[in-house]
A protein has these predicted regions:
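Conserved cytochrome P450 K-helix/beta-meander segment immediately N-terminal to the heme-binding cysteine loop
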Residues: 39-68
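Cytochrome P450 heme-thiolate "Cys pocket" and heme-binding signature region
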Residues: 63-97, 120
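Conserved beta-strand elements of beta-rich interaction domains across eukaryotes
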Residues: 36, 43-44, 84-85, 99, ...
Length: 139
C-alpha cells in the first residue's frame, strides 16, 4: 500500500502522450484525429473528485482494498502508463523495489533531517528540488 500511494503521488513519469484515434469533442474542446494529447499523471492522480478530499495527502490506507477501492475511476491510477503503451518493465520494477526495500530496511533505520524541505519538482521525472538529507542508523 505504501508503494502504491508513493507511486500515486510521485509517479516515475510526469506525462503520458497519446494521439487521438478519431475526432472527438471533450466538453468544449475539439480534439482532431492524430492530435497529441498530454496527460499530466501527477495532476490526474491527485484529483479530489477521483481520489477523495485527501487526494493531496499521503494516505497508504486508501489502497487497503486495492486500486478499485482507492479511486472512483481505477484507470486514473497510471504510474507506469496505461493501455498498449504501458511500461514493459513495471512488474520487474515493482519486484526490484520490494526486494531492495526489504534488504535496506532490514539493516538500516532512516529519518529525515530537521532541515528537510519537501519540494517535488516535476521534470521529465519527479525529483526533490532541494535534495533529500537523511539520517541513517543501523537497525
Amino acid at each position: 500500500m505504501v508503494i502504491q500511494e508513493t507511486l500515486r503521488l510521485y509517479p516515475p513519469a510526469a506525462f503520458v502522450i497519446r494521439a487521438a484515434l478519431e475526432d472527438i469533442t471533450f466538453k468544449d474542446i475539439m480534439i482532431s484525429k492524430g492530435m497529441n494529447i498530454q496527460i499530466p499523471i501527477p495532476i490526474l492522480q491527485q484529483q479530489c473528485d477521483l481520489w477523495g478530499p485527501d487526494a493531496h495527502k499521503f494516505n497508504p490506507e486508501r489502497f487497503a482494498h486495492g486500486i478499485v477501492g482507492a479511486c472512483k475511476t481505477p484507470q486514473a491510477y497510471m504510474p507506469f502508463g496505461v493501455g498498449p503503451h504501458v511500461c514493459a518493465g513495471q512488474h520487474f520494477a515493482m519486484t526490484e523495489l520490494k526486494v531492495i526495500l526489504t534488504l535496506i530496511l532490514s539493516k538500516f533505520c532512516f529519518s529525515l533531517s530537521p532541515g528537510y524541505q519537501h519540494s517535488p519538482a516535476f521534470r521529465l521525472v519527479i525529483v526533490p528540488e532541494h535534495g533529500v538529507t537523511l539520517r541513517v542508523k543501523t537497525a
